[in-house]
A protein has these predicted regions:
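Hydrophobic/aromatic residues positioned on beta-strands within the core alpha/beta folds
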Residues: 81-83
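C-terminal output helix
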Residues: 106-117
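Residue-level signal for the "D+5" position in two-component response regulator receiver
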Residues: 33, 57-60
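Acidic, metal-coordinating helix/loop segments flanking the phosphotransfer/catalytic sites
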Residues: 33-50
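Active-site residues of response regulator receiver
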Residues: 54
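Two-component/phosphorelay signaling modules centered on CheY-like receiver
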Residues: 13-32
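The feature encodes the CheY-like receiver
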Residues: 58, 76, 104
Length: 123
């Protein structure tokens, strides 16, 4: 990993995505945002070090997207943290889809710790 680690936030809640982006940029990350619809376009042009994805993306299913990413040779090694306000999130994690999961609402410091753990960044 050269330079700033890149985080891709896949979230349809614009306010949450922007607040998370701002926090992570302060912590010296490069941050990309997708609402899910343009995810594959972004991945064609960028290789993030980690993906943070909401399980519920409007009409899209974050769990299915995660499964597709883990089956694709180009993206299967990218760690994915799933976010959800619902208990069913643990199912996505248990299916070996996600590498981590965080329940909403969450503290940004909790998210940072999970990112640092999964991409091996010292605090």
């Amino acid at each position: 990993m050269q330079g700033k680690p890149t985080v891709l936030i896949v979230e349809d809640n614009v306010d949450l995505a922007e607040a998370t982006k701002h926090f992570l940029e302060i912590k010296r990350f490069r941050v990309l945002i997708s609402d899910g619809k343009d995810l594959y376009q972004i991945l064609e042009q960028n290789t993030p070090d980690i993906i943070i994805m909401d399980i519920a993306l409007g009409a899209l299913n974050g769990r299915e997207i995660c499964k597709n990413l883990k089956q694709d040779d180009a993206t299967k090694t990218i760690p994915v943290i799933m976010l959800s306000a619902h208990e069913r999130l643990s199912k996505a994690y248990d299916d070996n889809c996600a590498d981590g999961y965080i329940m909403k609402p969450f503290a940004l410091t909790e998210l940072l710790e999970e990112i640092q753990t999964l991409i091996k960044i010292p605090e």
